[in-house]
A protein has these predicted regions:
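Exported/periplasmic ABC-transporter solute-binding proteins
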Residues: 22-85, 92-95, 99-105, 111-270
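N-terminal secretory signal peptides that target proteins for export/translocation
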Residues: 1-6
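Intrinsically disordered/low-complexity terminal segments and short unstructured peptides
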Residues: 8-11, 62
């Protein structure tokens, strides 16, 4: 299993496209052969990493199915799916990526639902962070480098750019932006002291003791953040994928999402 990342929980994370292709091909043969337990390949936004690991651990123990994750920026995952990567479930951090795939016929009809929401926060280092009380402070001289997930492609960065444009700060802040591969990379840059501040999801802060929230976007003013999930049209394991989607809509999964700070958008299935 060279090249795969084995987590202490027993879950497996696929770091790249080629492994996703291989996992999908093998999984289809397992379902067609009528195997009792299936391997479900889930492409999910990086900001969902911790809650999905916990949900999957319990699900694996209860069902015997195996959940394999490819965790990255939603834009990266969408490109991989378009390129032919085989996966069962896509859990995106924005509606735009999901809609684009649905328009191309890559999403199974009737399976898409918006599950979660989040909020944007400005974070600084917990021990030596710059004094930031509002987005306007990001335009000041104390902030020279600001970490964002790529504002041209990655949902967290796109949401941040949209908000800063709305409050007429983007033109002043854009020269300071250090674009990162995904939102967790932006968080890591703040933790390491490589930037003065960052804009990430509120849920990302829950996993770090090295940063603190300096400001949170009010829900009535901030961008509308929505995490949709769906079965892929060419899922190698459609039945098992549907079962896992149903579990993600359960009250048990909702409790985990809330534990990690997500806002649940729909009523859960008991």
């Amino acid at each position: 299993m060279a090249g795969w990342v084995r987590l202490k929980t027993g879950l497996t994370v696929i770091p790249g496209l080629l492994l996703a292709l291989g996992a999908g091909a093998g999984a289809r043969s397992g379902e067609q052969a009528g195997n009792r337990h299936a391997t479900v390949v889930v492409f999910a936004a990086a900001s969902l990493t911790d809650c999905l690991k916990e949900i999957a651990t319990g699900y694996e123990k209860a069902t015997g199915d195996k959940i394999v994750f490819n965790l990255a920026a939603s834009s990266t995952l969408a490109r991989q799916i378009r390129a032919g990567a085989r996966a069962d479930v896509f859990f995106s951090a924005d509606e735009a990526r999901m809609q684009a795939l649905e328009d191309e016929g890559l999403i199974a009809k009737g399976t898409r639902r918006s599950r979660l929401s989040n909020s944007l926060v400005i974070v600084v280092a917990a021990d030596r962070g710059a004094e930031v009380k509002s987005p306007q402070d990001l335009a000041g001289p104390k902030i020279k480098r600001l970490a964002l997930a790529d504002p041209q492609a990655v949902p967290a960065g796109v949401y941040a750019r949209e908000y800063l444009r709305r409050v007429k700060l983007w033109s002043a802040i854009q020269p300071k932006v250090v674009p990162m591969e995904n939102v967790r990379a932006a968080l890591a840059a703040v933790e390491a002291g490589n930037v003065d501040a960052g804009i990430v999801y509120k849920t990302d802060v829950a996993i770090s003791r090295k940063v603190r929230i300096a400001w949170e976007a009010p829900r009535q003013e901030g961008p509308l953040i929505s995490y949709p999930m769906a079965l892929l049209a060419d899922a190698p394991q459609p039945q098992a994928g549907r079962r896992f989607l149903e579990h993600l809509s359960s009250g048990q999964a909702e409790a985990v999402f809330r534990k990690f700070g997500f806002i649940v958008l729909e009523s859960s299935v008991p």
